[in-house]
A protein has these predicted regions:
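Short beta-strand segments of immunoglobulin-like
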Residues: 2-8, 12-14
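Extracellular beta-strand/loop-rich beta-sandwich domains predominantly from IgSF
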Residues: 5-6, 43-90
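Flexible inter-domain hinge/linker segments at boundaries of tandem extracellular adhesion modules
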Residues: 1, 96-105
């Protein structure tokens, strides 16, 4: 399923992935391309990413979020998704989130 998040340009926006089971690692994908700067190293919430562009947050054992600090028009219609390595079993994928930038068509 795909959710849509709308944000104004030059603001911060939080995109939240809900995963249906506990994980030990999360990778973020933008437009189906893995961004290595957004990989969570473990499921203990110890290695959250923080940079000038993104702030990745482990909220609970099944919810993970990324904050894009400064939304730009280049991010309009981008598709975001978490792919997680669960505690047991095969990889799981979260909901997909399409980012809409307000005022840009």
């Amino acid at each position: 399923s795909t959710n849509s998040t709308v944000a104004a340009e030059y603001t911060a926006v939080r995109l939240e992935c809900a995963l249906d089971q506990a994980y030990r690692g999360v990778k973020y994908y933008k437009n189906n391309l893995f961004d290595s700067s957004l990989a969570l190293q473990d499921g203990n919430c110890n290695n959250d990413v923080s940079s000038s562009i993104y702030d990745a947050q482990c909220i609970s054992t099944t919810i993970y979020a990324i904050v894009i600090r400064n939304v730009t028009r280049a991010l309009h219609e981008t598709l975001w998704q978490c792919r997680a390595v669960p505690v047991s079993g095969s990889d799981i994928q979260s909901n997909c989130i399409t980012l809409q930038v307000k005022g840009i068509s």
